[in-house]
Amino acid sequence: MKADLLQRFIFDELDIRGELLVLKKTVQDALSRHDYPQAIQSLLGQALSAGLLLSATLKIKGDTTLQATGEGELRLLMAEATHRRTARGIARWEGAPDSTSLKQLLGNRAALAITIAPQNGQRYQGIVPLSSDSLSACLEEYFERSEQLATRIWLYESNGCWGGLLLQQLPAARGGEYSAENWERIVALSATLTADELFSLPAEEVLHRLFHEESVRVLQEEPASFWCSCSEERTLEVVKSLGREEAFSILDESGEIEMNCQFCLQRYSFGRERIEQLFDSPTLH
């Protein structure tokens, strides 16, 4: 499957939908801005993949944020994906983490939060304790605990590529045991997918190999990319939240107010004239 593409599909005769995703440049662009240890690079690539897969299950316009926190060597793992199939991410750590276990890296008080923020509508957040070693297992536990639609996620990484497969049970039209049997069969078939197949074969061939006895409708593929939503306007909103007294105190001490985006490291610098305009004007411009 080509890199930096998301392929959605649906089983016409079943109440199940799915997604395939392969990322390369998207993750590389997020990693290149920071000096992450190898273990953190791996997990952040998985988180970006998971964020894009989850966001594609939603019909709304807005952002989906996945955030894992704890008190271990890995303090924060965060990925944010949009309905435009763009993503950004960040991680914070201490020491020299080298474990492949997410649970071990996060340590005590580990938790996973998923936040859905529609452009128009009410923000939703669900938080669950994090108790599994892999991110995919933690996400599946989240869906089980939050009593949402049955969802399975497989995440893959190999030779500088990341990706995944997501399955989701739709609200059953037939109901009962018949739908449960369909779901279990499709899950079992999906579990046979290998990283080599996902990263080297076209999406249509991957789906044919997995589900050649099923009726699968392949939807239009969608490009994915790294994109940071930081801007001068948003940064000025942060400056304004400091208050006039604090902002001008920084100006008196440093001659300017400088801020760097934590995701893309873009630098924003504002002199006295711009800050005076900010506090003298009722709106940002």
Swiss-Prot record:
Presence of keyword Disulfide bond: yes
Main location: cytoplasm
GO MF annotations in UniProt: protein folding chaperone; unfolded protein binding
Top-level division of the source organism's lineage: Bacteria
InterPro entries membership: Heat_shock_Hsp33 (IPR000397), Heat_shock_Hsp33_C (IPR016154), Heat_shock_Hsp33_N (IPR016153), Hsp33_helix_hairpin_bin_dom_sf (IPR023212)
GO CC terms of this entry: cytoplasm
Function recorded in the entry: Redox regulated molecular chaperone. Protects both thermally unfolding and oxidatively damaged proteins from irreversible aggregation. Plays an important role in the bacterial defense system toward oxidative stress.
Protein name (record): 33 kDa chaperonin
Localization per Swiss-Prot or TrEMBL: Cytoplasm
Changes after translation: Under oxidizing conditions two disulfide bonds are formed involving the reactive cysteines. Under reducing conditions zinc is bound to the reactive cysteines and the protein is inactive.
Biological process per Gene Ontology, one example term: protein refolding
Family, as annotated: Belongs to the HSP33 family.
Annotated disulfide bonds: 228-230, 261-264
